[in-house]
Amino acid sequence: MTIGTTDIFLLVIIVSTLIVGFFWGAARSVLLLAAWVLAFLAGAHLKTDLGSYLAREWGQFSVAYNDMAAFGVIYVGLLLAAPVIIFIGTRGNQRISKYQVLDDLVAAVFAVFVAVIGIGGVIIVLATFYETGPGALDTGGGPQWTATLYADLVSSTIGGGINEHILPIIGWVLGPLLPSDVREVFA
């Protein structure tokens, strides 16, 4: 097992969410999980609409790439906006039990879980273009940096583990709610 630059970056994300979740509160962390589901499903279902707009604006990229980019923009945009909206929308004590340490631990675990499935979501978004069809990782339809990001994520130790173990669970849980082209990633 080797730890590369991508693994260090993913580890920093996961540990950062552990710390933030510990101080943020259990109720907010549970809301963040719901926001992840909403962001992922919204991105999966709205990607074609935004993708057709991007295809008109970015004629140099393929339609499949524009759909993937639209999925990513919606997913990442909502996922980044969610903590701000949750923080502004919640007031007062965020405890769910009478034991502060239990609340802090539950919040940290939920935050780490959201970070892991958030990384998994990015892998799924990229896989909708790079993992399907012939010429996987062929950058003819998109810029090189997205292909490199996908290759680095799935070949890293942490990203590969998420890809192998977490993504099938996401596919099993959310599969019936996803469009068929996104479900193909889990096949």
Predicted regions and their residues:
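Alpha-helical transmembrane segments and their juxtamembrane interface "caps"
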Residues: M1-A187
